[in-house]
Amino acid sequence: MPDQIQIEVVYALPMRQTTLTLKINTGSSVEDAIRESGILARHPEIDLAVNKVGLFGRAVALSTRLERPTRIEIYRPLLADPKEIRRQRAEKAKLQSLK
């Protein structure tokens, strides 16, 4: 039997966070771990073709192999373009400073 590692799969919403802990075989992919965790059944809005994933805040591919205990994070899509928001804030601040 292959060695197993303990991992967490985390998905955060604005008002709550789901954290699932499980043991998987060493060398399993991030995608395998997510599917095995059952989080997709709890959160049907997660689409692995759309949602980005990461390990401790660093984006990784679904095919990344897991060799040590870790935390897999599933990220929600951005609601707005960060560059556009910064541009709008700068424009608003400029207008307010002219008053």
Swiss-Prot record:
**One Pfam match, by short name?**
Ub-RnfH
Question: What SUPFAM superfamilies does this protein's entry cite?
Answer: MoaD/ThiS (SSF54285)
UniProt xrefs under InterPro entries: Mopterin_synth/thiamin_S_b, RnfH, RnfH_sf
- Source organism superkingdom: Bacteria
Question: Signal peptide span per the entry?
Answer: none
The UniProt entry, under NCBIfam families, shows:
PRK01777.1
The family assignment reads: Belongs to the UPF0125 (RnfH) family.
Name of the protein: Protein RnfH
